[in-house]
Amino acid sequence: MATTENAESGSPENKVDRADPDAKYPLKVLYCGVCSLPAEYCEYMPEPAKCKQWLEKNFPDVFAKLTLGTAPKQESKGGGGGEDGGGGRGRGEAPPAGEEEEKKKQKRGGRGQIKQKKKTVPQKVTIAKIPRAKKKYVTRVCGLATFDIELKEAQRFFAQKFSCGASVTAEDEIIIQGDFTDDIIDVIQEKWPEVDDDSIDDLGEVKK
């Protein structure tokens, strides 16, 4: 009998020792309205961001406690490669979505600005007479491309107009065989009226 009494009397004592003195009974468990699990497990769900929004809106005090308690864990999980690390990436996907879209718009706008800068080249045509061997000369025409004039078309036009050889020798340069500096300006302005007097210069005789 003594043994039974001791066992029975010892059982409540053991239960009291194992109980949390600060706990209040019965305990109330808060279940998330999104995933239907206890709030402590929201961070392990596929969409923890929605769970946090619901918790912050309906139970801000509980949300604050959970945020403070899990902040260090979230930092360590973000660098992990396991399932928890994947959860950390899931939590970070929603906020940066708008930022990534904004960056794409900025990049597209930046490329547009570069194209505009390419069109700031001054529109200028220069004519020059260059000496060749045996007192011969060639006429050099530069700058037609700044007026969006096709150089191949201009080269054929000059060759036909002056009945001589003409060739495109550089990115924006045409060489005409012969000295036509007295007539070339009038010919150019007649063919391409957009090249006015202020946009064309006669450099005279120059060395190549």
Swiss-Prot record:
Residue stretches of biased makeup (Polar residues): 1-12
Alphabetical GO biological process terms: formation of translation preinitiation complex; translation reinitiation
List, for all copies, the residue spans of the domain called SUI1.
125-192
Compositionally biased residues, Gly residues: 77-89
Protein name as catalogued: Density-regulated protein
Q: Which Pfam families match?
A: DENR_N, SUI1
Q: What is the lineage of its organism?
A: Eukaryota, Metazoa, Chordata, Craniata, Vertebrata
Query: Which molecular-function annotations from GO does this UniProt entry contain?
Result: translation initiation factor activity
- Of which family is this protein a member? Belongs to the DENR family.
Chain intervals with Basic residues compositional bias: 105-120
Q: Where is this region: Disordered?
A: 1-20, 69-120
Q: What does this protein do?
A: May be involved in the translation of target mRNAs by scanning and recognition of the initiation codon. Involved in translation initiation; promotes recruitment of aminoacetyled initiator tRNA to P site of 40S ribosomes. Can promote release of deacylated tRNA and mRNA from recycled 40S subunits following ABCE1-mediated dissociation of post-termination ribosomal complexes into subunits.
Keyword annotations for this protein? Initiation factor, Phosphoprotein, Protein biosynthesis
- Record's superkingdom? Eukaryota
> Can the keyword Mitochondrion be found in this entry's annotation?
no
Give the Phosphoserine positions (modified residues). Answer: 9
